[in-house]
Amino acid sequence: MALLTEIDQSRALLVNDLALVRWSLAKTYLRDLQRRGAAIVPSLWHDKMSPDIIQSAFAAHGTDRVIIKPVVSTNATNTYLLTRERAVALESELAETFRDRPFVVQPFIANILTDGEYSLFYFNRTLSHATRKVPKPGDFRVQEEHGAELTSIEPDPALVETGASVVSLIDPTPMYARADFVRGPDGRFLVMELELIEPSMYLRMDGQAPGRFAEAFDHYVKEHRGVSA
């Protein structure tokens, strides 16, 4: 962050805005989105681990499977899918992993296994393209690094509407943004994560996406530098 602050205070233009970078570093931005009206995957937030937290989360979420992950992490690092039994078996490991480390506990959304995770990509709040990632058999993680299958999609109109609503809640306007969603048990699309810090944009999945990105970047620079079009 010190380097980013130095860049922001220099003549260089930091993209996205430093305020957005700071805000999105920790997954607690999901709480802010929820307060602003976004539907997120239900989340319980904790600053440190204690023996009863995980077991109580099963009851709180009304589920037999939960996901626990650090508030600051990437690529599903230190992310666990837990049943009650596995939570007991891994009690010592979980205590060590999340000792004095903020984390979030969410219900496992089973649709992720078959329906996958939907990602919408925006340049200056305008939707560019969309993808779907489905975990490999026997896994729950949707990252390519873990073997997930990535495809380009034409997003469902309801997903497009939900995505536009979520992105409108981000302030200031990001030059680029990726919004990840999962379909909840009731069919609604729920926000899993926002990616505002150099995310994988999968420009290769849409032949027009690189051009859209370049045009959006040009517009962003001119707007923030006061350059006439």
Where do the protein language model's features map onto the residues?
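Short secondary-structure junctions
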Residues: 38, 62, 169-175
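Short glycine-enriched loops at secondary-structure junctions
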Residues: 20-23, 133-135, 182-184
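C-terminal active-site "lid" helix and adjoining low-complexity regulatory extension at the edge
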Residues: 171-174, 183-229
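Short acidic loop-to-beta-strand element that houses the catalytic metal-binding Asp/Glu
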Residues: 119, 179-182
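Generic enzyme active-site microenvironment
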Residues: 15, 67, 178, 191-193
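Phosphate-binding site of ATP-dependent enzymes
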Residues: 77-172, 190
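Active-site nucleotide/adenylate-binding loops and adjacent lid/helix of ATP-dependent enzymes
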Residues: 2-11, 18-115, 157-160
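Hydrophobic residues on conserved beta-strands that form the core of alpha/beta folds
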Residues: 40, 105, 176-178, 191
